[in-house]
Amino acid sequence: MANRSTFLSAGVFTREFDLSFLPEVIPAVGAAVIGPTVRGPALVPTPVSTYSEYLRWFGDVFSSGSGASEKEYKYLTTYAVQEYLRWGEVITVVRILAGQYRPAYSFVRSKAGKDANSYAQNQMSFKITALSDGEITNSGRTTAALSGSGKTTDESTQGSLVSGSRYNMRWEVANVDNNRGTFDLYIRRGDDSDFRKIIMEQYVGVTLDPNASNYITKVIGNQTYALRYDSGGTPYLQLTGSYPNRSRFIRVDVIKNTLNYINNDGTVRDGDLSGSLPAAFSASVPTAFSGTFAFGSDGSVAHPRAMYGDIWNNNSQGFNLAVSTYSTPYLDAIDILSNKDQYDYDLLLTPGLIDNLQDHAKVITRAISMVEDRGDAFYIIDPTYKGSTVGQAQIAAEGRNTNYAGYYYPWVQIVDADLGGNYWVPPSAIVPSVYSFNDLVAEKWYAPAGLNRGGLDQAIQTERLMTQNDRDNLYIKNINPIATFPRTGVVVWGQKTLQKKKSALDRINVRRLLIAAKRHVANTAKYLVFEQNTIETRTKFINITTPWFENARK
């Protein structure tokens, strides 16, 4: 074939350049929600793409109260996630806990310390810590308190835990091999029994030798995020630990290593190293033994929790926002989500925060400032507590002026099949489904409202049946009514932002159009950063961005 890199005779030659190339497809952008959950890591933004994945990480139903007053509930966070993920692709969950919260943990005794009554670390082989913070993962009163039978003192005679539940867990060690320095570790569900084990994870043939490929910390992981503050008081997450977590439930820290346990010829290098292995019992005692998790704490969460329509200034799902101990976690979560490089979302939700409750409003103000500073997210706010009038909603709206947030009124009643009843929830717990449905069937610059895209099919009824005059009075103050119409049901009937000045940006679809446009330009142009400022680079940028804007114009 002729070489066409040089041309000796006259002629017209063409050369082709692909100026539309992008290395990867831009990932989906979803919502972010801040609020309490049943379990999960606290203050660590965690993306989930399905509701079942959310349940695995954060749970759903919990009980509060005691005796005849004990009831089962769901946090409003759960409803918001469930509604958004009906049509949406991903939502980032930030769990809130207050005060000195901590995860449950357990020590596994070493062979040398199995008969000791002490919990000194020199008696322990390794420590297992739950990835989930809070007391929900406590399955016993102590950790690895062994009785003479190799069972924990928290077990019944049938091998089930007195405090076992589907939300907590227990561990079991089996098949300790002194010749190889290996053992098996099983993570079991807290409500199983020795006769009907529910094994959630199993790690076979792990070792305490840090040079081995099956070193237990390498296999399971030991990383966690610690909340830190910089010199200016801004919170950030500091990663600790050397090995990524492969377990969905635990992390492991080895206390007694067995360095180079096996020689090259397959023999045990030092017989004393076997004393570091998990305790093995005599022939008259089972070779498998188990333990429970304890000492997990929810911190300063108030009991009983005020739920649903009982939410008030000093108790919103167990959080008294009049006290800094409770408000600070919300503020920390908001500040953490301000990191645009790390967390990508275009819709912010804080179900449980009510704007006409004084101390809630302070937190909401911080959240508004955060989305305005980011410039790429819209914030759904609940203006009033249950039972508030149209006039009270109007008063709340007078104190806000932003095109990065919107109000919806009134509260809505939904059916909860898991709890077997009807419950009142604020708009931010159900309206997210309208946004995700709108984005699925249309585009972000379409109005998330009306009979075609604004239906709330999960809703039974609204707290108040509004007249045309009520809707007009709300809309004048930039509050989006949730209306009820015969034969059509409950519908979002407005799409205004909280901007007071009349302009195109007092409409939610226009604000979301600009958010989407800025995100598209930013995500595509970053591949051209540090490229030469040439006509080819500029042409590439135009070719990348123009089709998106042409589509938005249609």
Q: Positions of the model-derived regions?
A:
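Negatively charged, low-complexity tracts enriched in Asp/Glu with abundant Ser/Thr
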Residues: T143-G150
